[in-house]
């Protein structure tokens, strides 16, 4: 599992882009920002006439005019208030030069900036100007400051001996003082020379050059650095460098130095074109100073590519590829492209063509497994060709026809494992009859599969049957109904009862000759089959196994039903679903007794959701084995959620060891015993500035805490800070069965607010998603 280290983000060079905004604080911050009154005039404002009002005016046509007392000057979006304004005109009549001189104080406003100052000069034709001893504030966004001198041009402003901050009036939490600031209006960024970063007036950082965003446009330059310390990395520092190549291309390069490991290079390239979008990323460490690989001087790296595109109207291309240099890469390095707890890296590519009645695709799929003790990983499917066709409303609307067909080749990194081609065709006919009371669906299907298998090339590879043909018919009848009634003991409520009955028949075929007899949690059965995790909804699935290599026999009846309660407004407030499979004969895939259903019925499965009120929610699921009179699985959550970002959740999870081993594999249960956990999650905004998240999970079987987390974040209009302390169960290489290992970490982040497109997030959602057991909201019936 990835170690979480102490992290101090130095919010000095730029601002982070937030994904989730805190509406209340954001609105309050905007209330402190000046807004432009009136309609914005577009076009060439310089060509518009100038209107002047004043208490007194002395006009000497055509050369000059002097206005005294409550002078009000307007030109398009520009508005100037002053006590004394002198307007002079020179040049010829065709190209006049009009200048305005303001003395003894002024108040200037337009749709981009407001300014107060002592003296000013304005070119009324070009909009150039020069202001002294001025204060300025952006319109419609955060940003203000002072300057000894401001020179105005059409597209930029030059400020001498100036300051800048995104804090509102009355808040001087941080500011940047610079000998010169240039603000580019259209490009929406500011350059600063000899910049001193101050916190409450105290200088804490100096840089000869600095860039800050003052708008929504992305800018090339240095992004926010991060630094910290950890037991494995030592002291480390990472400096992202952003390159805005084009509006639809950008690159972030992040060199990272670790005192115990050396230099690591990280890069991420994003693209958006007319035929698709995607992201390509890489991480590379040339020489490992500290790790289990240090002795052989192994180079460690990661490659990631995600792509989605549509082209030529009917074509789709999807790629999701992650590869790392070794199995323990994500244990040693913190990466946003994967986690060791995932167990594997996905490597998938697919190109498909779609038409209304059919589609086909060509794909390749494989996994890179992280488990150290697994020496035989899952098969790769390269290539795989799928074709699907459907034709509805046959026989005057009584029949629907579907066809799924596939050709795929399987091979494995282990030479002990056989390789194979699988050819599969799956036609089906169904007749669906429905009305307001329910529906009846009768379906017949045929699974026709051919395998051409080849023995592995390893010395002890097992023999396999070269050719296997398997044909399995299937018949299914599915009946659903909806019955409704008013409830006498609950006035203004309506109850529905939705019985669901399904009969499924498939004859038995011995499939032990498909694939290898070897089996582990990653191999499954055959080439791509594994038991499907059981719940209420799985009771009505056609097959117990995923993939096509194990299609179990079936002669079973599934009985289930759902009841729902609706209030007078038609809103669903409560539901309860329960069901069970009754096996008329054992479901089998081969002659191995371990692979057949050992009892005459499945476990009872229940699912329920209850919207107690608009603030309280409850959800529960339960599976009970009637043959052992024991609980297989139980989950329940009770949540109080009065408003966005405020919640308290109490939850309980239980799964017995047999259920875990059967559905998730023995590798998912490191301690080889029942899992029984109780948890408490709290997330709360205190006023509009403070947010607190707490999370505690206790394993009742181990009698140990599984995860503990406390996070506190302070938010203001111009800065935010958060502290998170966490302790959770983790693992390490060569861990013994009964050994419990904890990972302790503390993280601190600082962030500037009000710059660029930076929103004002509370931090609650981000803190809730952190951790080994992230928060999952109790199901809402909204």
Curated annotation (Swiss-Prot):
RNA-binding in keyword set: no
Localization per Swiss-Prot or TrEMBL: Cell outer membrane
Keywords on record: Cell outer membrane, Membrane, Signal
Cellular component terms (Gene Ontology): cell outer membrane; transporter complex
Keyword Cell division: no
Signal peptide positions on this chain: 1-23
InterPro entries: LipoPS_assembly_LptD, LptD, LptD_C, OstA-like_N
Pfam families in the record: LptD, LptD_N
Domain of life: Bacteria
Gene Ontology biological process terms in this record: Gram-negative-bacterium-type cell outer membrane assembly; lipopolysaccharide transport
Quaternary context: Component of the lipopolysaccharide transport and assembly complex. Interacts with LptE and LptA.
NCBIfam families assigned to the protein according to its UniProt record, in alphabetical order: PRK03761.1
Family: Belongs to the LptD family.
Biological role stated in the UniProt entry: Together with LptE, is involved in the assembly of lipopolysaccharide (LPS) at the surface of the outer membrane.
PANTHER family, per the entry: LPS-ASSEMBLY PROTEIN (PTHR30189), LPS-ASSEMBLY PROTEIN LPTD (PTHR30189:SF1)
Protein's UniProt name: LPS-assembly protein LptD
UniProt organism field: Haemophilus influenzae (strain ATCC 51907 / DSM 11121 / KW20 / Rd)
Designated gene of the protein: lptD
